[in-house]
């Protein structure tokens, strides 16, 4: 990282170290290329009344940072000084400012040796966007959220959920919850040693330790922590030596009453090319799935993001995004950011027509249009009932339950109204459909087998 000058007024001297930390964290998290493109020429100008004022070199850079990174920058400032309430970005320096120049530290997370990875620099590996406060909770993720929160808030060495195993598809919130656990512990119990990393990095560090004959240091590093969080554990499938080391690390931490949190794209029982003894241990504690989002959850996520970004978006645009971008949360938020950025840069109003044009490529890639008829056929086949049973009034459990599941999936995977869905199921009214959806949601709270079954049906339908 090249030396960067940071400018601030005399009255902002108490924020000198804060800005240097914020700038360094932006560099660590986003990397040199992105940092140099957007942040390297941003100066700290002034602070007053709990507001930090930054100066961007051009209107374009200012608008881009405001649309993409303003919340990240504010949260970073608040991490170091919680009296800061807002960040303002301008393009012209304030008159009469007395400038003090400092140099950013040049050490990055990549330069930190393995022996230094402790509670003091866990912050470098955590994304400031991912906290419990901005995690939107709904039926698909409420168990995982509650379990993650319990782990973070536990006053004992470990929670009752040890290990906590979170699984689900890409972009549904598993990584968000793991970062949120790390943030909560960092802020409320800073003396606890926490390691968060991907299984891929765990493997690379292990291989490096073998090559450099530093295996003892590697073992000491991972087996002396209070909380170990490993993301995407499926990466070690088929990696025999890494599995062996993970197995012994896992056992040591459990034996020493330390907390473990694991994430994966599938349940422990569905992992291939991994030893049975590891599978067994991964399921010792609480296994919580994060399944595909419902329309209501997607709507809540969009409304939360819009409020955070302090922008106004028409309701029909929000409804359109929630109905059309159904694959995962990451893609949903990306679509929202793209619409807002386009409006900022072109100064065009956000309308449904503009949104459809801006996202046409993304919508085309999502264009595996799922119909109620598709859902009825797949569910009927899965449960070995007649397709005609979907529109019948038969109340036998072996028929009624699949029909309720099909109604739930129709509401989750299609933009159809309750009334429209009811028509497809033998002209049933919207209250019948609403009752079916509510019944399935209640069952999903405690029935792990049903959650896995519905996840599987969603994957089949979406692919």
Curated annotation (Swiss-Prot):
HAMAP family: DnaA_bact. This is Chromosomal replication initiator protein DnaA. It comes from the Bacteria. One of its GO terms (molecular function) is ATP binding. Residues 344-463 are annotated as: Domain IV, binds dsDNA. InterPro entries: AAA+_ATPase (IPR003593), Chromosome_initiator_DnaA (IPR001957), Chromosome_initiator_DnaA-like (IPR020591), Chromosome_initiator_DnaA_CS (IPR018312), DnaA_C (IPR013159), DnaA_dom (IPR013317), DnaA_N_dom (IPR024633), DnaA_N_sf (IPR038454). Residues 125-343 are annotated as: Domain III, AAA+ region. Keywords: ATP-binding, Cytoplasm, DNA replication, DNA-binding, Lipid-binding, Nucleotide-binding. GO terms for biological process: DNA replication initiation; regulation of DNA replication. Plays an essential role in the initiation and regulation of chromosomal replication. ATP-DnaA binds to the origin of replication (oriC) to initiate formation of the DNA replication initiation complex once per cell cycle. Binds the DnaA box (a 9 base pair repeat at the origin) and separates the double-stranded (ds)DNA. Forms a right-handed helical filament on oriC DNA; dsDNA binds to the exterior of the filament while single-stranded (ss)DNA is stabiized in the filament's interior. The gene is dnaA. It is found in: Cytoplasm. Oligomerizes as a right-handed, spiral filament on DNA at oriC. Residues 83-124 are annotated as: Domain II. It comes from Rickettsia canadensis (strain McKiel). ATP binds at residues 171, 173-175.
């Amino acid at each position: 990282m090249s030396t960067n000058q940071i400018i601030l007024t005399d009255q902002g001297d108490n924020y000198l170290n804060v800005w240097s930390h914020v700038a360094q964290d932006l560099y660590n998290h986003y990397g040199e290329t992105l940092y140099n493109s957007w942040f390297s020429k941003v100066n700290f100008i002034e602070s007053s009344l709990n507001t930090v004022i930054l100066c961007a070199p051009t209107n374009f850079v200012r608008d881009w940072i405001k649309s993409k990174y303003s919340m990240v920058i504010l949260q970073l400032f608040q991490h170091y000084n919680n009296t800061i309430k807002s960040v303002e970005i301008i393009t012209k320096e304030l008159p009469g400012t007395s400038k003090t120049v400092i140099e950013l530290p040049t050490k990055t997370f990549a330069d930190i040796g393995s022996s230094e990875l402790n509670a003091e620099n866990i912050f470098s590996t955590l994304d400031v966007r991912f906290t419990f406060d901005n995690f939107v909770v709904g039926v698909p993720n409420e168990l995982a959220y509650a379990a993650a929160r319990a782990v973070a808030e536990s006053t004992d060495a470990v929670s009752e959920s040890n290990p906590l195993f979170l699984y689900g598809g890409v972009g549904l919130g598993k990584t968000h919850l793991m970062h949120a656990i790390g943030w909560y512990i960092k802020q409320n119990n800073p003396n606890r040693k926490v390691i968060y990393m991907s299984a891929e990095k765990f493997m690379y560090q292990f291989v490096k330790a073998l090559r450099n004959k530093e295996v003892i240091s590697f073992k000491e590093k991972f087996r002396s922590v209070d909380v170990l969080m490993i993301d995407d554990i499926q990466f070690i499938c088929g990696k025999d030596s890494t599995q062996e080391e993970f197995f012994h690390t896992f056992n040591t931490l459990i034996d020493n009453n330390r907390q473990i949190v694991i994430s994966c794209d599938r349940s422990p029982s569905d992992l291939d090319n991994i030893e049975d003894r590891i599978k067994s241990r991964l399921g010792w504690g609480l296994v919580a799935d994060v399944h595909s989002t419902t329309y209501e959850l997607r709507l809540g996520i969009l409304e939360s993001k819009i409020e955070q970004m302090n922008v106004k978006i028409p309701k029909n645009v929000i409804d359109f995004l929630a109905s059309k971008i159904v694959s995962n949360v990451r893609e949903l938020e990306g679509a929202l950011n793209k619409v807002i950025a386009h409006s900022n840069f072109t100064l065009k109003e956000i309308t449904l027509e503009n949104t459809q044009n801006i996202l046409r490529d993304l919508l085309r890639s999502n264009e595996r249009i799922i119909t109620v008829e598709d859902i009825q056929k797949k569910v009927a086949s899965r449960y070995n009932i007649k397709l005609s049973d979907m529109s019948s009034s038969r109340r036998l459990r072996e028929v009624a339950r699949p029909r309720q599941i099909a109604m739930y999936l129709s509401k989750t995977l299609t933009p159809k109204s309750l009334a429209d869905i009811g028509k497809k199921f033998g002209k049933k009214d919207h209250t019948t459909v609403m009752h079916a959806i509510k019944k399935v949601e209640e069952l999903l709270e405690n029935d792990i087998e049903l959650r896995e079954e519905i996840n599987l049906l969603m994957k089949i339908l979406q692919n």
